[in-house]
Amino acid sequence: MFTGTIFNSLFTLPLVISQFVPPPTRPVDLWDPFKTTTTPFPHGGVNQGLNRDEVVVRLPLGDIVGKEVHLHNLPWTIHKDPTEELPKDGTHFDPNPLKPKNNITVFTFLGVPYAEPPTSQRRFKPPQQLTVFPGKQPYLAFNYAASCAQDVEKSPSPFVDHPYPFMVDEDCLYLNIFSPDISKNAQTTYPVIVFFHGGNFQTGSANEWPAHGLASRGMVVVTVNYRLGAFGFMSMGDSETGNYGLQDQRLALEFVKNNIVTFGGDPQAVTVVGHDAGAASIGFHMQSPYSRHLFRSAATMSGAEVSYHSYIGKTALAFNNTMKLGRYAGCTQAVAQHRWDCILTRSTGDIIDATRNIPIEYNRYLFMPTVDGKYLPGNPLWTLVNAPSGETSIMSPVPMLIGMNAQDGSEVVLEDRRLGEFSQFNDVDHEYLKSYSLEYCYRHNYSMNREATADAILSKYTFWPDRAAAWAIKENFIQFATDAYYTAPMQLSSHLHSSSGSRVFQYVNNYNFSRQHPNLLFIPDWMGVCRDCDLYLMFGYPFLPDELRPIGLRGINFTDTDRNASRTFSNIIRRFSYHQNPNFQFDGSWAAYEPRRHWYINFNYTHEEDWKIPGTLARDYRYQDVAFWNEYIPALVNYMTTTFSPENVAYRREIMVFKWITGVNVIIIALLIVLAGAFGYMVWGNKEDEEAAYKAENHQLVEYRDTGHSVSDATISSRTRSPRSRITNL
């Protein structure tokens, strides 16, 4: 019995120990074992001091130097938010309330490499892990690195005449770190936000989203560059090529897991936040076996992995797009591998120019994530649909925050650069709506009832009281693009994830920024709640000085209402990163999304006191319109012009097969008849020709009168006979 007790203890001891694993701690600095300074000396073997606003941390890759940035007059601190002082009963307030204005220091490390440069022999290949920081030590992380190579003219922006503010290069695998505290004597670590930017996998950059304001809320924020377009997703249709951009993101997550504790972050408390293509990327990582255990929660904004426009489901299409790129880049080799090798010799500009000139037949773009059977094991929609039955599995069914902006589709208008250059995006008329509807159907390969499908879309989004009303046409076009590209996929993703094991919280941002004169330059009246408006709120730009805002937002006059909305929305992200639940501690009214109860928060603030609650709880956001795209349009596409009742589907197939066989038989019989006629003509026609020719010879035989003469003495016509005639007469 005693032996059995020891035996049981040996097997239960590891389980007991695992329950008391200590939280991650910051590494001990051999230059400063007693944690008396943030700056280790000497670094790089040189006894060199730092400027007052510079800080250095030590990683296994080498020393890295960043900067301090001071933010002033903020209504929160890194440890407390004003909403946390509001008790549920409304009577017992915090005895140590926050001051109305607080100063916070954020530590920034910009342009930090997380992989070897994907150039030269590493071009169009999976990213390789970095072993040491490049260049002279320590590594100076003071400025943003280059954005990934892209066609900057495709970027949806109201500033069509403004040059792109960052350099672009294929050497672009860098990230930016914003931390509220890197002191080695800190007693705690902070949750981590890893942000993947949007741009439909074609454009965008982490550099466009400075995160000082979000980091000041008590989170370590990491913004990531990843390869785009052909450079990130060109594929031969196999499991060895393509999806480089997704693999870049995964390697960045591994970098965070291995190093973020040095910057004050908790590697076990990582929340991935993605916008547009970044949101779809998160859905792909949740399904990929290669991204397991790299994050504990996810927030997807204005994008979904189930959208037709987020991935290429057929490897043959990915292969064909690559071959087209080769042809347009001047590579005409007949062997596919040789053409691929030729593309690798083309410059960055050559590839961008060739991609721009290729007509797109299917989907919105040529190069996107591909279902390769490896990194993306299966079709994302099919995987989610079959997950509840156990036929497929979601590798990372983490808690999710899913949301969008009310007019996300405005980016489709902004993407049309010609529309902006020639008419300031004003020439959206009925013909524009009609042509776009038909083009939408062509891109979706709606070969059945293509025109009927386009007519259904046009009918739904036509303003029938006045078909010529310009304001109504543009408004309806934006709603069409919003529903098709954002609302319907978001609702479908929420439904499937909530059915597959994830706890889902949904929001819709209906907050309109103030519209004074300077603001109209970056958010015109017609745009409504723009595609990036929730990011402006989340990153806290209304609280930042001009020099720390994105270039397009400098000079904007944000109001107190704007700041109030930003404070509340960023606190939603803060609560979710800390607790995987966006509810405030005194208010649990934000109900989770359910498959049959589609709860969401309508985020719309017009009064300053409204910041006390996260929004208005509602149900079934635009569900009638969602059904149009997710149910009616697919059914209409599959509807045959000549149809039978549903119960006779098998009989209909037999009829179709019979028609095909009958048609083929008729064609064969007709061919046989034609061949027989031709053969008969050759046989009988030649004989008739010979007889006619013989008669035409005008032969005259003389009556035989002398029995002493032979037939050769007979008198023959004076006309000369042909050799053939002689043979015949003999």
Curated annotation (Swiss-Prot):
Could you list which ranges are Cytoplasmic topological domains? 685-730
A matching Pfam family: COesterase
Domain of life the protein comes from? Eukaryota
Q: In which tissues is it expressed?
A: Expressed in the pharynx, intestine, and in several cells in the head including dopaminergic neurons.
Q: Name one GO cellular component term.
A: plasma membrane
Write out the entry's keywords from A to Z: Cell membrane, Glycoprotein, Membrane, Signal, Transmembrane, Transmembrane helix
Record's subcellular location: Cell membrane
GO annotations under biological process?
A: cellular response to paraquat; negative regulation of response to oxidative stress
Gene3D superfamilies recorded: alpha/beta hydrolase (3.40.50.1820)
UniProt KW Phosphoprotein keyword: no
Q: Give the positions annotated as glycosylation sites.
A: N103, N320, N445, N512, N557, N564, N604
Q: What is its main location?
A: membrane
TM annotation in the entry: 664-684
Query: Which residue pairs form cystines in this protein?
Result: none
Q: Which residues lie on this side of the membrane: Extracellular?
A: 19-663
| Membrane topology per record | Single-pass type I membrane protein
The record's PANTHER family line, in alphabetical order, gives: NEUROLIGIN
What functional role does this protein have?
A: Probable neuronal cell surface protein thought to be involved in cell-cell-interactions. Confers protection against oxidative stress. Plays a role in protecting dopaminergic neurons against oxidative stress-induced neurodegeneration.
Per its record, how is this protein called by name? Answer: Neuroligin-like protein glit-1
